[in-house]
């Protein structure tokens, strides 16, 4: 319970453990007087209608003597009325102590009829009443008389215990033992109090006596008051006693632990002093002044800017006035060590030989012409203008295409140090900017740590997985990167730990990302985006032959001539055991093949080992990816679309079925909102062109259309399926079949225009990988064809269209006849 001296009717129990007296006085006097008196008022003397005194945050039990301060006007009137009519008053607790003038709904129905033993008027107008609970009672009706509340009450008689005497005695003893345990844990003498408890042999009275002296919430005390059965009431009290004993035990443990901690600190201090004396006798002691001199010397050699030097001198002066073993001195020494070890002036000399840099890039990576050209352009500019600011390049593409390893090769070609910072899953802004030195264990941010590890002012820092930065209540790391990645600001980058500006303008920042849409707009605006699309099968074959196979042979202890594998076998691995835009799975499969061969060699078989296509399944198991047989002609209502995923392009089957119905459109296959809208647009276009396409004009009312895109467990979205949806829908409505060697992509409008989409290279690669002969793309995507190698263009015929009318003649085996209105005929739908 919590008492507030400003409440109108608040118990100021000098006997309870939470009063204003000292703790020892509270505990020693609590039980002795609260046990009641021998001349308790008998229930028959109590009238049935008596004044009500609402209580805040206190419940009065039978036989308990409690002082109350009464301050509310109508409460004062109720007490004064009670003193003139038999001294009896009905005490009931408020459900909400904040209510100033409680009504019947705000009061508990069960309370205690009490006798006013003494009344004293205070100088401020309040009353101080000493009351004794004499009987539980239930309020039947409440009346408002002359400004105060009166109640018609029913006295509640306590039933006789129904348990065996032995069980009753066991409960009484356990309750007393718990009380004794609590008193002992609090260091309160138990003799007198336990004597009082031992004399109370009625379970109900003992429960009330203990409950009146426990720290109980109003709801908990009211629950005990309303419980009439004495054994049940004692059980409730024992539950609270057990909880109180556990809390007291925990308090003792905490106090003991704190005391031991203080003792240990004192012991450590004396041991340190003794250790100092021993070291001094041995001549090993390092004087604090000598240590400061060493730090100062290191700082002088660091070549600090004037602003940083000013802060460092300030910290050195503070350090010189502190005790060497103080915690603050350790923090300052660590800070000064960080300042001394950072590369304030040291830079590495750039390798400006363009031809040598080109050779290094070509040795480490196959293809990637755009990125290599961009790096060589940067070198050329640096050669002509050494003061030029470095670009901030972001390599965007699917996993496994070499974005991270490319950063290391760029650093090697430039002759610079390389540092990588993984940003995946980072949520705390302090990871970038550091923690302020006021925090225990504070450290600089990851950028400053990378600069220290690099040891030069102009390293290459790769910010890996920049699209996977998070944010929460600890801040937004992407916002903290804005300053570091802005060429106009990063010459004065501020780290919270250093609290002095640090120049990052000489750093070449590189970033990698899988999903550009996940990068915040302000951060993306500072990046020069360079896309890394997936590799073609020919590129993968060349990389496997030139880079991956030699690497795996070396890692598995094989020589180059000990494993002979043909291009056909490598193509089979690429085609049937991996399906990705990058190279990671292909490297794993080739590594698995090399391990199998290494085992044969270790078992005593003599190389060389020649791998044939028939042996691939023996070594690598059943092929994981087997393409469906491409049908020359698809069933009506089916068309092949193209989709882009972070892992590369994919073939997308779109199926449309029509049945008799009422014009409902059903879409299944986990379609996103944009794809659903594309389906609606396709349906609207088909309805608007029904006459010219020889489709029944009332098909939208007489049949239901079901559009399904297989792989239902995979979410799909985007506008690029619009052309395919329209083609499949018209195919289903006309009964015409779409060519099986044709795939398509493009956004559709209500007027039938075909709009450009993204991921053209990856989509064309998917069509080639499936063995399709034709692909339809929007005319405005013609510029993207430059990224597609010539060998791929020879394998697939690329058709560019700007309107759906250009798609239909290419899509159907037979051209759909254009029918004028005069010759319009109805054709049954499939």
Swiss-Prot record:
<dbReference type="InterPro" id="IPR027065">
    <property type="entry name" value="Lon_Prtase"/>
</dbReference>
<dbReference type="Pfam" id="PF22667">
    <property type="entry name" value="Lon_lid"/>
</dbReference>
<feature type="domain" description="Lon N-terminal">
    <location>
        <begin position="50"/>
        <end position="245"/>
    </location>
</feature>
<dbReference type="InterPro" id="IPR046336">
    <property type="entry name" value="Lon_prtase_N_sf"/>
</dbReference>
<dbReference type="InterPro" id="IPR027543">
    <property type="entry name" value="Lon_bac"/>
</dbReference>
<dbReference type="GO" id="GO:0006515">
    <property type="term" value="P:protein quality control for misfolded or incompletely synthesized proteins"/>
</dbReference>
<dbReference type="InterPro" id="IPR008269">
    <property type="entry name" value="Lon_proteolytic"/>
</dbReference>
<keyword id="KW-0346">Stress response</keyword>
<dbReference type="GO" id="GO:0016887">
    <property type="term" value="F:ATP hydrolysis activity"/>
</dbReference>
<feature type="active site">
    <location>
        <position position="763"/>
    </location>
</feature>
<dbReference type="GO" id="GO:0004252">
    <property type="term" value="F:serine-type endopeptidase activity"/>
</dbReference>
<dbReference type="Pfam" id="PF02190">
    <property type="entry name" value="LON_substr_bdg"/>
</dbReference>
<comment type="similarity">
    <text>Belongs to the peptidase S16 family.</text>
</comment>
<protein>
    <recommendedName>
        <fullName>Lon protease</fullName>
        <ecNumber>3.4.21.53</ecNumber>
    </recommendedName>
</protein>
<dbReference type="InterPro" id="IPR027417">
    <property type="entry name" value="P-loop_NTPase"/>
</dbReference>
<feature type="active site">
    <location>
        <position position="720"/>
    </location>
</feature>
<keyword id="KW-0067">ATP-binding</keyword>
<dbReference type="InterPro" id="IPR014721">
    <property type="entry name" value="Ribsml_uS5_D2-typ_fold_subgr"/>
</dbReference>
<feature type="region of interest" description="Disordered">
    <location>
        <begin position="1"/>
        <end position="28"/>
    </location>
</feature>
<keyword id="KW-0378">Hydrolase</keyword>
<keyword id="KW-0963">Cytoplasm</keyword>
<dbReference type="InterPro" id="IPR003959">
    <property type="entry name" value="ATPase_AAA_core"/>
</dbReference>
<dbReference type="GO" id="GO:0004176">
    <property type="term" value="F:ATP-dependent peptidase activity"/>
</dbReference>
<feature type="binding site">
    <location>
        <begin position="397"/>
        <end position="404"/>
    </location>
    <ligand>
        <name>ATP</name>
    </ligand>
</feature>
<keyword id="KW-0645">Protease</keyword>
<dbReference type="Pfam" id="PF05362">
    <property type="entry name" value="Lon_C"/>
</dbReference>
<dbReference type="GO" id="GO:0043565">
    <property type="term" value="F:sequence-specific DNA binding"/>
</dbReference>
<keyword id="KW-0547">Nucleotide-binding</keyword>
<dbReference type="InterPro" id="IPR020568">
    <property type="entry name" value="Ribosomal_Su5_D2-typ_SF"/>
</dbReference>
<dbReference type="InterPro" id="IPR003111">
    <property type="entry name" value="Lon_prtase_N"/>
</dbReference>
<dbReference type="GO" id="GO:0005737">
    <property type="term" value="C:cytoplasm"/>
</dbReference>
<dbReference type="Pfam" id="PF00004">
    <property type="entry name" value="AAA"/>
</dbReference>
<dbReference type="GO" id="GO:0034605">
    <property type="term" value="P:cellular response to heat"/>
</dbReference>
<comment type="function">
    <text>ATP-dependent serine protease that mediates the selective degradation of mutant and abnormal proteins as well as certain short-lived regulatory proteins. Required for cellular homeostasis and for survival from DNA damage and developmental changes induced by stress. Degrades polypeptides processively to yield small peptide fragments that are 5 to 10 amino acids long. Binds to DNA in a double-stranded, site-specific manner.</text>
</comment>
<keyword id="KW-0720">Serine protease</keyword>
<dbReference type="InterPro" id="IPR015947">
    <property type="entry name" value="PUA-like_sf"/>
</dbReference>
<dbReference type="GO" id="GO:0005524">
    <property type="term" value="F:ATP binding"/>
</dbReference>
<dbReference type="InterPro" id="IPR054594">
    <property type="entry name" value="Lon_lid"/>
</dbReference>
<dbReference type="InterPro" id="IPR008268">
    <property type="entry name" value="Peptidase_S16_AS"/>
</dbReference>
<dbReference type="InterPro" id="IPR003593">
    <property type="entry name" value="AAA+_ATPase"/>
</dbReference>
<comment type="subunit">
    <text>Homohexamer. Organized in a ring with a central cavity.</text>
</comment>
<feature type="domain" description="Lon proteolytic">
    <location>
        <begin position="633"/>
        <end position="814"/>
    </location>
</feature>
């Amino acid at each position: 319970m919590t008492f507030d001296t400003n409440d109108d009717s608040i118990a100021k129990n000098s006997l309870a453990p939470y009063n204003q007296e000292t703790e020892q006085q509270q505990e020693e006097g609590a039980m002795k007087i609260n046990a009641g008196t021998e001349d308790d008022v008998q229930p028959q003397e109590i009238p049935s209608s008596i004044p009500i005194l609402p209580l805040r945050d206190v419940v009065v039990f039978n036989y308990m003597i409690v002082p109350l301060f009464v301050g509310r006007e109508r409460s004062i009137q109720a007490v004064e009325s009670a003193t003139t009519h038999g001294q009896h008053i009905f005490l009931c607790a408020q459900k909400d102590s904040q209510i100033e003038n409680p009504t019947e709904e705000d009061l508990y129905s069960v309370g205690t009829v009490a006798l006013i033993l003494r009344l004293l008027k205070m100088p401020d107008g309040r009353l101080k009443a000493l009351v004794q609970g004499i009987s539980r009672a239930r309020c039947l009706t409440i009346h408002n008389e002359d400004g105060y509340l009166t109640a018609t009450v029913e006295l509640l008689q306590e039933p006789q215990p129904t348990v065996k005497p032995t069980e009753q005695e066991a409960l009484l003893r356990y309750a007393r033992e718990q009380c004794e345990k609590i008193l002992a844990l609090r260091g309160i003498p138990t003799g007198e109090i336990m004597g009082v408890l031992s004399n109370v042999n009625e379970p109900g009275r003992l429960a009330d006596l203990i409950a009146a002296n426990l720290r109980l919430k109003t709801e908990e005390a009211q629950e005990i008051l309303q419980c009439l059965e004495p054994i049940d009431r004692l059980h409730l009290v024992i539950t609270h006693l057990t909880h109180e004993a556990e809390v007291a035990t925990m308090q003792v443990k905490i106090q003991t632990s704190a005391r031991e901690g203080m003792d240990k600190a004192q012991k450590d201090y004396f041991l340190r002093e003794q250790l100092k004396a021993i070291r001094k006798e041995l001549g090993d002691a390092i004087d604090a002044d000598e240590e400061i001199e060493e730090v100062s010397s290191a700082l002088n050699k660091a070549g600090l800017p004037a602003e940083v030097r000013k802060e460092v001198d300030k910290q050195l002066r503070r350090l010189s006035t502190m005790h060497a073993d103080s915690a603050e001195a350790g923090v300052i020494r660590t800070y000064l060590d960080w300042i001394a070890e950072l590369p304030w002036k040291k830079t590495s000399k750039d390798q400006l030989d363009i031809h040598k840099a080109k050779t290094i890039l070509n040795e480490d990576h196959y293809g990637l012409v755009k990125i290599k050209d961009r790096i060589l352009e940067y070198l050329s500019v640096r050669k002509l203008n050494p003061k030029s600011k470095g670009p901030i390049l972001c390599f965007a593409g699917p996993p496994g295409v070499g974005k991270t390893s490319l950063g290391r090769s760029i650093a090697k070609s430039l002759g610079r140090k390389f540092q990588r910072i993984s940003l995946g899953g980072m949520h705390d802004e302090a990871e970038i900017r550091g923690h302020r030195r006021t925090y225990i264990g504070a450290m600089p941010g990851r950028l400053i740590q990378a600069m220290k590890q690099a040891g030069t002012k102009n390293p290459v820092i790769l910010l890996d997985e920049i699209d996977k930065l998070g944010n929460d209540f600890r801040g937004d790391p992407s916002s903290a990167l804005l300053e570091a990645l802005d060429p106009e600001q990063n010459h004065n980058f501020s780290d919270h730990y250093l609290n002095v500006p640090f120049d990052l303008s000489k750093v070449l920042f590189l970033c990698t990302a899988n999903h550009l849409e996940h990068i915040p707009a302000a951060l993306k605006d500072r990046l020069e985006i360079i896309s890394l699309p997936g590799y073609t099968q020919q590129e993968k074959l060349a990389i496997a032959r030139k880079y991956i196979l030699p690497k795996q042979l070396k890692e598995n202890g094989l020589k180059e001539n000990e494993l002979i594998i043909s291009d056909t076998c490598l193509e089979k691995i690429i085609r049937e055991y991996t399906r990705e835009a990058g190279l990671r799975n292909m490297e794993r499969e080739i590594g698995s093949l090399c391990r199998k061969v290494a085992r044969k060699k270790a078992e005593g078989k003599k190389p060389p080992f020649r791998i044939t296509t028939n042996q691939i399944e023996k070594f690598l198991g059943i092929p994981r990816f087997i393409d469906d047989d491409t049908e020359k002609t698809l069933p009506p209502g089916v068309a092949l679309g193209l989709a882009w995923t972070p892992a590369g392009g994919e073939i997308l089957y779109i199926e449309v079925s029509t049945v008799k119905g009422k014009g409902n459109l059903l879409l299944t296959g986990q379609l996103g909102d944009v794809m659903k809208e594309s389906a609606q647009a396709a349906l609207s276009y088909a309805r608007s062109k029904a006459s010219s396409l020889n489709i029944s004009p009332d098909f939208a009312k007489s049949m239901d259309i079901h559009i399904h895109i297989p792989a239902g467990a995979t979410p799909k979205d985007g506008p690029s399926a619009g052309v395919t949806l329209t083609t499949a829908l018209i195919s289903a409505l006309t009964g015409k079949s779409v060519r099986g060697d044709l795939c398509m992509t493009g956004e559709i409008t209500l007027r039938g225009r075909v709009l450009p989409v993204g991921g053209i290279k990856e989509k064309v690669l998917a069509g080639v990988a499936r063995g399709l002969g034709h692909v339809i793309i929007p005319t405005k995507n013609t510029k993207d064809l430059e990224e597609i190698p010539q060998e791929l263009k020879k394998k697939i015929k690329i058709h560019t269209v700007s309107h759906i009318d250009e798609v239909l003649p290419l899509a159907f085996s037979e051209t759909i006849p254009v029918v004028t209105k005069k010759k319009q005929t109805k054709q049954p739908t499939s």
